[in-house]
């Protein structure tokens, strides 16, 4: 089960377990290759269920992709709003997991200093594809969709979330009163933004309904650059509960509900 970007992560894991990676195999002919990249781990995963996953990326992430500082500040604000006011700066429990870039919190380093070092790192200005923000960008997600395909021996299910409503006058989608205040800006932007730029994923009104950071359309299944089969009418049982239905096919995205 994967929530938000976790859904993209487990899709990639399934792709690697089932098929390995040709580039890794070609680069590791001395026997040092990890079994993860050999394609010898089929049938390790029975099913994949994604919750509010941006399979097609988030149009808001695309907006802030050019300014990673805004994205990080936004994420920190959400963390703070969830943690509450009583946050111990020296024991915040936050690890950016960027060790491979040398961005490790040093002994006795304050989180403020650690955070500033991360935000001011040169890795953000290189626009590398080896960062999560690329996979969350709509164009980057399309690349991932073309690589991490639905596997024919795995069941796929998805659940979307919405916390917006349609404005009858403009047709735009607006945040509900229950929306986390930190997501009002992103939700409002997503609920009216379109982009028809040539050479990029087109953002149409179909993307407007959202949960604050992920559009319902994106959470249903991979669309952009994807050949995955799908059933968008899988639904729930008569009792309103998720029920595994007879005849459910593997290798097919089954959309449950929002």
Residue ranges and their predicted role:
Residues 2, 6, 10:
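Gly/Ala-rich beta-loop-alpha elbow adjacent to hydrolase catalytic centers
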Residues 23-24, 30-258:
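Helical cap/lid subdomain of alpha/beta-hydrolase-fold lipid enzymes
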Residues 17-21:
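Active-site catalytic pocket residues across diverse enzymes, especially alpha/beta-hydrolases
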């Amino acid at each position: 089960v994967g929530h938000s970007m976790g859904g993209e992560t487990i899709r990639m894991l399934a792709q690697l377990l089932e098929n390995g990676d040709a580039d890794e195999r070609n680069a590791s002919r001395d026997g040092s290759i990890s079994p993860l990249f050999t394609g010898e781990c089929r049938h390790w995963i029975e099913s994949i269920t994604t919750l509010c996953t941006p399979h097609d990326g988030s149009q808001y992430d695309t907006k802030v992709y050019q300014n990673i500082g805004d994205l990080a500040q936004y994420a920190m604000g959400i963390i703070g709003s969830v943690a509450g006011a009583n946050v111990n700066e020296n024991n915040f429990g936050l690890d950016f997991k960027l060790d491979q870039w040398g961005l490790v919190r040093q002994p006795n380093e304050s989180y403020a200093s650690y955070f500033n070092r991360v935000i001011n790192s040169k890795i953000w200005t290189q626009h590398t594809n080896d960062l999560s923000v690329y996979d969350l960008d709509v164009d980057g997600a399309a690349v991932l969709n073309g690589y991490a395909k639905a596997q024919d021996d795995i069941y796929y299910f998805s659940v979307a979330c919405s916390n917006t409503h349609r404005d009858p006058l403009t047709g735009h989608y607006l945040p509900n009163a229950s929306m986390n205040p930190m997501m009002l800006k992103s939700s409002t932007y997503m609920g009216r933004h379109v982009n028809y730029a040539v050479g990029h994923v087109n953002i149409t009104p179909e993307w407007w309904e959202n949960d604050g950071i992920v559009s319902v359309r994106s959470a249903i299944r991979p669309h952009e650059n994807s050949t995955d089969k799908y059933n968008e009418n899988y639904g729930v049982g008569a009792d309103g509960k998720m029920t595994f239905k007879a005849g459910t096919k593997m290798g097919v995205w089954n959309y449950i509900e929002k």
